[in-house]
Swiss-Prot record:
Family: Belongs to the bacterial ribosomal protein bL19 family.
Function according to Swiss-Prot or TrEMBL: This protein is located at the 30S-50S ribosomal subunit interface and may play a role in the structure and function of the aminoacyl-tRNA binding site.
Record-level GO BP terms: translation
PANTHER family, A to Z: LARGE RIBOSOMAL SUBUNIT PROTEIN BL19M (PTHR15680:SF9), RIBOSOMAL PROTEIN L19 (PTHR15680)
Descriptive protein name: Large ribosomal subunit protein bL19
Keyword terms, alphabetized: Ribonucleoprotein, Ribosomal protein
A molecular-function term among this protein's GO annotations: structural constituent of ribosome
A cellular component annotation (GO) from this entry: cytosolic large ribosomal subunit
InterPro entries, per database record: Ribosomal_bL19, Ribosomal_bL19_CS, Ribosomal_bL19_sf, Translation_prot_SH3-like_sf
Length: 113
């Protein structure tokens, strides 16, 4: 193991649940406003997960008042308090970019049995 891998290993979090594209997750994000810090929940469908190690990221998409909102988070970020998996989705793709064009019930993902 080289030096970079050793440094990266120290930065990895071990409290991340197993989740993938199609899963609905609650991401509890630490938000700093002035001197105060609070936790904001971002609930949506994971549309992609990419990278590896410290650089691994995932993108969550949700509809807010008829507008699609996507947010990309680093998996091992200290700004994420915790991730909670709400439902497991049954999808056949690793990247769910096609959900961007779908609205309403068509954008719904079947739940894994």
């Amino acid at each position: 193991m080289n030096r970079l891998d050793f440094v990266d290993q120290a930065s990895l979090r071990d409290d991340i649940p197993v989740f993938g594209p199609g899963d609905t997750v609650n991401v509890h994000v630490k938000v700093i406003e002035g001197a105060k810090e609070r936790i904001q929940v971002f609930k949506g469908v994971v549309i992609r997960r990419q990278g590896g190690g410290v650089r691994e990221t995932f993108t969550v998409r949700k509809e807010s008042y008829g507008v699609g909102v996507e947010r990309t988070f680093p998996v091992h970020s200290p700004n994420i308090d915790h991730i909670q998996v709400v439902t497991r989705g049954d999808v056949r793709r690793a990247k769910l970019y096609y959900l961007r064009e779908l609205r309403g019930k068509k954008a719904k993902i079947k739940e894994k049995r």
